[in-house]
Amino acid sequence: MNFDNLEREDEQIAHLVQKEKERQENSIELIASENFVSKAVMEAMGSYLTNKYAEGYPSKRYYGGCHVVDEVEDLARERVKKLFGAEHANVQPHSGSQANMAVYFSILESGDTVLGMDLSHGGHLTHGSPVNFSGRLFNFVSYGVDKETETINYETVRELALKHKPKLIVAGASAYSRIIDFKTLREIADEVGAYLMVDIAHIAGLVATGLHPSPVPYADFVTSTTHKTLRGPRGGLILCKEKFAKVLDKNIFPGIQGGPLMHIIAAKAVCFKEALEPSFKTYMEQVVKNAHVLAEALESYGFKLVSNGTDNHLILVDLTNKDITGKDAEILLDSIGITLNKNTVPNETRSPFVTSGVRIGTPAITTRGFKEEEMKEIASIINDAIKEKDGDLEPLKARVKALCAKYPLY
């Protein structure tokens, strides 16, 4: 992209933008929640649409001059409904957290009981963490993974639901590498008279391409971000049954947000169009293949994988047997150009600021063009770095740079 105007107006910010571009180009990005947008998405984000205020919804705005942005938002809504086979869509949420908040405010009262996945077992802050608004406003009861299999035990979820009678069951995760059984969760919700909300922020791209079962037929609400496996701008979306459309829209605007970000909604529309193309399914298939190969390669070096593998785009690695914490592994690998994040593991014994594990994802590197052979090399580099953490890391930095040079970012 051309940053001539930025360079003239603000050299410091222009320099930092360039610096970040170089960091991304010369690093292997394994953070599961990150991806690289297309130039088309980026151009939409930096378009004239950023100038327009448009409180309300298409044909029901509180400002004049909205006829063009109405078309933009309508396109985004229609495309995402087609992508997921949904009855209603709201594309205004600024983030996944705000998407979840809007659903909660649509059907819950303060203090209502909700069943959600424990953050330390793979859930998300907004699924009831006591430090988050969700855990502060509502009575969340957490479910986790089985101690032996490290996967969700649906009978345990059912028992908790029968005991606590939640008004809402929340499914979805930020660090869970296995298929989630939405049909069974719907049956549990029906048994106790609960609503079902599914947060597919991490797996949206897999769901859209049929590589993970869709929650849309089963859930009352489905929320997501647009910037992870969907490869779009940073933002959120909500899908729901038509009967919830009015109450949901009201709880986004004027409930928790004012004016929507029309340049971001345009970029969402572009990413939905891209996700409807056959090439996007090919991309997502490669994401999953890469995750499988990377997982197998890491296992061959003695790394302990939570649940012994992956069905999706991410891998949760328990480093307990490697004599290194998640925090130290993150810092070590960052120093050679591999970016990932420390992450709690089931039955965690360390602080969330230290952790016993790391989370690894393949969406971003797959966007760059990395395939199976590169996964084997990445696993080898990670193993060598941790094994030789107090040794000379320069050869490993060179191996990372060589991989990055083969696959330019743009």
Swiss-Prot record:
Gene3D superfamilies the UniProt entry points to: Aspartate Aminotransferase, domain 1, Type I PLP-dependent aspartate aminotransferase-like (Major domain)
GO MF term list: glycine hydroxymethyltransferase activity; pyridoxal phosphate binding
Reaction it catalyzes: (6R)-5,10-methylene-5,6,7,8-tetrahydrofolate + glycine + H2O = (6S)-5,6,7,8-tetrahydrofolate + L-serine
Subunit relationships: Homodimer.
One GO term of the biological process aspect: tetrahydrofolate interconversion
The name this protein goes by in its record: Serine hydroxymethyltransferase
Function according to Swiss-Prot or TrEMBL: Catalyzes the reversible interconversion of serine and glycine with tetrahydrofolate (THF) serving as the one-carbon carrier. This reaction serves as the major source of one-carbon groups required for the biosynthesis of purines, thymidylate, methionine, and other important biomolecules. Also exhibits THF-independent aldolase activity toward beta-hydroxyamino acids, producing glycine and aldehydes, via a retro-aldol mechanism.
Modified residues (N6-(pyridoxal phosphate)lysine): K228
Record's keyword terms, sorted: Amino-acid biosynthesis, Cytoplasm, One-carbon metabolism, Pyridoxal phosphate, Transferase
Main enzyme class: transferase
Binding site for (6S)-5,6,7,8-tetrahydrofolate: L119, G123, H124, L125, S351, P352, F353
UniProt similarity note: Belongs to the SHMT family.
Site positions (Plays an important role in substrate specificity): H227
Pathway: One-carbon metabolism; tetrahydrofolate interconversion; Amino-acid biosynthesis; glycine biosynthesis; glycine from L-serine: step 1/1
Cofactor: pyridoxal 5'-phosphate
